[in-house]
Regions:
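Transmembrane helix boundary and interhelical loop/hinge segments in multi-pass membrane proteins
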Residues: 86-106, 120
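Terminal transmembrane helical anchor/hairpin motif
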Residues: 3, 11, 28-67, 179, ...
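Hydrophobic/aromatic residues in alpha-helical transmembrane segments
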Residues: 85-89, 137, 171-172, 217, ...
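Long, hydrophobic alpha-helical segments
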Residues: 68-94, 191
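Secretory targeting signals
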Residues: 23, 27-31, 67-73, 117-169, ...
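Aromatic- and glycine-rich beta-strand/loop motifs that create alpha-glucan
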Residues: 1-22
Length: 264
């Protein structure tokens, strides 16, 4: 518990900044985009064959609805969430090596397993807090922009996807962190991984290649599919949970066995 509290306290600044940034952005932008895109369906003929919609996985008819506008904005929030999740996972591991505190931490009366679990729990708590603020701000924005004219389940699934994608990249970040503990530029690495993953997803949609889509977590939260079916795609959720479990177990095993190395 001591390690958990310490790690969560260390993440306090990040939690405040990300919660405020995501919540404020979606709250103020959503009503504007709902109004702006409400007439998009009337101009559908002008956008026929536009490859942009294929790349982002939506269409004009969906965009013209309040929930469609929210889905469109969620695409960009997912990218931000992926960067934050990856950065959290990387940072919570690599900071011990960068700050040369590994020898001190690992010689305290705590097992490595407890240290890892405490770090993971603190990072997951941070993601949940950020996700909760985003959810509430999204709900307030939807109420303000659509006058309550939307399906709450669909909205909840779209909003929850921001938390889930952060969880996915958090576990991936921790795995990368235990393998390459001396990474200094965590933000750059996180942004790069998030962007490459998005490119895989965009390429998958454009080419209609399902296999490539499995390499992009963004595909797992396809807004158009969620809006039409009011659910996530089952196989993607199974894959997501499986990968997160594999990343976590592998990272835990490496962390517990890795030699203590102090950064020079």
């Amino acid at each position: 518990m001591t390690i958990f509290k310490y790690e969560l306290k260390q993440l306090r600044g990040s939690i405040i900044v990300w919660s405020a940034a995501l919540a404020a952005s979606i709250f103020f932008m959503l009503p504007v985009y709902i109004e702006m895109l409400s007439g998009a369906a009337k101009m559908s003929s002008n956008f026929a064959g536009n490859s942009f919609f294929d790349v982002i996985g939506t269409n004009v008819d969906i965009l013209s609805t309040p929930i469609g506008a929210y889905s469109f904005l969620t695409i960009f929030v997912l990218i931000a969430g992926a960067i934050n999740g990856m950065k959290l996972g990387l940072g919570i591991i690599t900071k011990e090596y960068m700050n040369k505190t590994t020898d001190f931490l690992f010689t305290k009366p705590h097992s490595r397993s407890k240290i890892f679990v405490s770090k993971l729990t603190a990072a997951v708590s941070a993601v949940i807090i950020i996700g909760a603020f985003y959810f509430l701000a999204s709900w307030a924005g939807m109420q303000n922009g659509s006058d309550g004219n939307y399906n709450f389940l669909t909205f909840a699934l779209l909003a929850l996807s921001v938390t889930l994608i952060q969880m996915f990249f958090l576990t991936l970040g921790m795995l990368v962190g235990v393998i390459f503990p001396h990474i200094r530029t965590t933000v750059a690495v996180s942004a790069g991984v998030a962007f490459v993953s998005y490119v895989f997803g965009a390429f998958s949609r454009k080419m209609g290649n399902v296999i490539i889509g499995y390499f992009s977590a963004y595909i797992y939260f396809d807004g158009a599919y969620i809006i039409v079916n009011n659910s996530y795609k089952v196989e993607y959720m199974i894959l997501l949970a499986s990968l997160m479990l594999i990343f976590t177990i592998t990272a835990h095993q490496i962390f517990c066995k890795k030699d203590v190395m102090v950064a020079s």
